[in-house]
Amino acid sequence: MFPRNAWYVACMPDEVADKPLGRQICGEPMVFYRNAEGAVVALEDFCPHRGAPLSLGFVRDGTLVCGYHGLEMGCQGKATGMPGQRVNGFPSIRSYPVIERYGFVWVWPGDASQADAVKLHHLEWAESSEWAYGGGLYHIRCDYRLMIDNLMDLTHETYVHANSIGQKEIDEAAPKTVAEGDTVRTSRFMENVDAPPFWKMALRGNGLADDVPVDRWQICHFTPPSHVLIEVGVAHAGHGGYHAPADKKASSIVVDFITPETETSIWYFWGMARNFRPDDAALTASIREGQGKIFSEDLEMLERQQQNLLRWPERNLLKLNIDAGGVMSRRVIDRLVAQERAQTGAPRAGAPRAGAPRAEVTRDIPVRTAT
């Protein structure tokens, strides 16, 4: 169950070079390649001749050529040539709107007539020379909503990431969750605490002492269809915390673009953008390595959680106050999916999707809607 009329990250630009890239997104097999002008093209990964995956072919002079019998496909999904054949009557395949922007390739898997670049959220950190970014990609076998749950409730850091970013004060700081239209924000602030190992490294990277108490913050922003950006940082205690001057803190944005592959697998584009010492390539590499290790710690937990949910779909799950961010984000997703079904006349699902429990028990969820 995914919103389809939305922009999803399909790949990194360097993944689409001289060869076609096959990738399934929202349950739809797609092939990405660059045309003669260097622009990224997305087509259905299906040759109309014999059904072979076009991603197993090659690109010749900006034209996608099927690797089975040499059928050539145009950018709009129409066959343009084939050795010894007339292709005018060949059936077309689907093409998808694509945008290359902010260091990512984005694809619109839904109604192409509704695709609009204006609907792509502006990412200031991706365009400004005052910011540096480093990230990567993981393939994870879990429902994309489990990843959203994980990122909108950072209480798990105390346990899953105990040796990097976790600390007991995260448990002790009550989160505050606010819904504003289709966005959800969960905030948590900690004062006068010790910085965990990752943030000690970040403080040193910004030329700051790492052996003094700090104020720490985590502000998680969910935006449809499945994007989570998290403002994180630490500041020397007593200087204003989140609002501390730049020479007293180390702050960043954790970037999480979650693209469903199937109902139980995702492409997870992760990274961190920072606005201190953006020209320090060694620091960018060090932070990227640290973030990669941190995110890798979630993989086994999420995949084993997915296996349990598939094995026991009738089990009731609790929803506690710490789960409010994920709960509210799921409500946004449910609403958008329902709206799309109403527009297309598609029937409503009569049963939970794979990996989703049939019922949940709600307890202690303070959720506030902004007006």
Per-segment meaning from a language model:
Residues 39, 116-371:
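C-terminal catalytic domain of Rieske-type non-heme iron oxygenases
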Residues 2, 7-132, 365-371:
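Rieske [2Fe-2S] iron-sulfur-binding domain
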